[in-house]
């Protein structure tokens, strides 16, 4: 029997959940009902079988946003600063389609509940990016809000009441608040300087792999990946 490897989970307004399948070679989004029934929700888009799929978000209008980090397999080939084959899928009343492509390891994305803009972390491009969303759901006016530095690999995100964006950074085990003007403040940190240095050297040499992510741990916290 097929069992998804859920990486992202979203609650549906009418009950149930959407799960992203982050398989070794396959992806997609699956719907899980409260009684335990699992059915495919999205397995192909624009003629493409969904690669291993990272994240799913249901916005305030009921639109569904899905991220794929990389088309490369194995996925750790995408752990490169120059890799830009990640994309974002929108599922709405018009169907499913890719609305942004060429992203640097697309991770969590959220639509801001007040501004209606979409924010997305590009983990191995090490930046937080924002798009305006048109009435038809197209993503336009791509803006880099901030770029991250040594040991910082943005993964999860959420918003606060002052239009700040809270970001989790794997490897450095940080929670970083990014203000509206792009300034940054470290809120939480539990990191190992030796591990950061080892990982940074591999990243700069295009040799970053799973071992650099899986071994990361602070004194009290393991990898902080989501909020």
Question: What are the language-model segments listed below?
Answer:
Residues 1, 39-46, 95-101, 141-148, ...:
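A short beta-strand motif characteristic of beta-propeller blades
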Residues 22-24, 69-71, 123, 133, ...:
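Short loop/turn segments immediately following the C-termini of beta-strands
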Residues 131-138, 180-185, 190-191:
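Short loop/turn segments immediately following beta-strands, especially the blade-tip
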Residues 28-30, 86-89, 127-129, 174-176:
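A short loop-to-beta-strand structural motif that recurs across blades of beta-propeller domains
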Residues 31-36, 81-94:
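Beta-propeller blade signature
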Residues 26, 82-85, 125, 139, ...:
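A detector of repeated loop/turn-to-beta-strand junctions in beta-rich toroidal repeat architectures
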Residues 2-21, 46-64, 70-72, 82-88, ...:
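Beta-rich, blade/repeat-based domains predominating
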